[in-house]
Amino acid sequence: MYQLKARCSGLADLMAKPKSGNGISATARSAVRKIVKYDLFGYQDFEGNKYTEKGIALEEQAIKLSGRKRGLALKKNEERRENDWITGECDIYIPTRKLIIDTKCSWDIGSHPFFSDEAEEKAKKAGYTIQMQ
């Protein structure tokens, strides 16, 4: 029997509240449909763009800088972790410290959050706060 398994990066969409009433939101319904299409047929409507390409290209540098700021020698996590309901692959995982870090690279100076409240708001809006729980 098929059992849906969500990616951590998609949890915010799955947990979106409906605009009115109770039940499942249109955003959550759409997210479930995307997961099922991928699981059953390998279909994915988003395969990246210039923003994700830049993030991938700068990922190693972002990990090194994150480590420098924390005084740690960090390296890219290559292991996907999962349980019965969710799956995900974080950028950095340090089990001895119970530390998970997911780096993000801004596209340009206009999209970079310079202030902590701005960074927190962007993370919340993008669903990263749910993803990292």
Describe these PLM feature segments:
Residues M1-A57:
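Charged, glycine-rich intrinsically disordered N-terminal tails and low-complexity linkers that flank
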Residues D45, K50-I56, E60-Q133:
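Mg2+/Mn2+-dependent nuclease catalytic core
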